Every structure is written in structure tokens, then in C-alpha cells.
Amino acid sequence: MRRNAILLSAIAVSALAAIAAFAQAQGGNVRAEDVTFLGQPVTRLQIVRGREIYAQNCASCHGANLEGQPDWKRRLESGRMPAPPHDESGHTWHHSDQDLFAITKLGVGGVVPGYESDMLAFGEILSDEEIAAVLAFIKSTWPERQRDAQARIRAKEGGG
């Protein structure tokens, strides 16, 4: 009995250490405490979870490395815009957290009536917490300059 308890404890400690190491390796070079979403600090676990959700739901259009589709500033034959990058080369950081959350949840057309986009509305696919985790992951990849610029936009628009 005691032997099983020791074995289970050792397994639990090993699993926690592995999760912590994985979380640290997955989150980029930014410390989690340097990233906020809707004015609240995010955790390393949120960033790691966001990266996983991004890979499953967003990378097929926005790129595995957040690079967006090629020639993303030029309209497609359909008249729609390609998926933009979410790294510092794109314009994601030009928008407040509230706007990014709304666009992800409702789709671009749900935020800008009449705008046609290939972007899905993820509100029925992902929970609010999952959307927030994806956005925390994206923000964790931005250099300090972009995070600071986006923070000024959030402050100007009321903190979101």
C-alpha cells in the first residue's frame, strides 16, 4: 500500500515537472506575466493551451508560425482578403483585445456588417476561454514594441 502511494507520488511529481517544462518551452521568449488579455495577466498555461487551440483551428489559414497567407494585402479573385499574419508583421496588434475577441467570436462580418470574409465565426466552435487563450498565445509572440502599442490602443478605447 505504502509502496503504491510512493509510486503514485513520484509519477505525479514527474508529470507536473514535464508539464511545467513543456509549458515553458512552448510559450516563446516572452514571460507570461508580460502578457495581458482584457487588462488581466495571463498564465503560461493559457499561452500553451492557446498555442494548441491555434494549431488546431487557426493555423490552416493564418499559418503555423502566424505568418498569414501569401500576399495577404491583396484581394483574392473572390474579392475577399487573404488571412493576415498574426505576428508583428501583420495588423492584429493594431486592434484592442475587445475587438480581437469580437472578431474571433462573431467573425469579421459580425463586427463589421456587410463585410465579407472567409474568417469563420468561432463562437459556436470555441468557448470564450479558448478564444482568450488563443489571443493570449498570439500576443505572447509579439515583441515588446507591438505589445506596448497594442496596450496604448486598449487604454485609448477604454481598457479592453
Model-derived segments and spans:
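Positively charged n-region of N-terminal signal peptides that target proteins for export
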Residues: 1-4
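Hydrophobic alpha-helical membrane-insertion segments, chiefly the h-region
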Residues: 10-24
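Electrostatic cytochrome c docking/interface patches
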Residues: 24-53, 148-153, 157-160
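Periplasmic/extracellular electron-transfer cofactor-ligation site
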Residues: 30, 44-45, 51-81, 105-115, ...
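General structural signal for secondary-structure boundaries
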Residues: 43-46, 96, 127, 143
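Extracytoplasmic electron-transfer domains, predominantly the class I c-type cytochrome c fold
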Residues: 75-139
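A charged, solvent-exposed segment within the mature domains of Sec-exported extracytoplasmic proteins
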Residues: 124-160
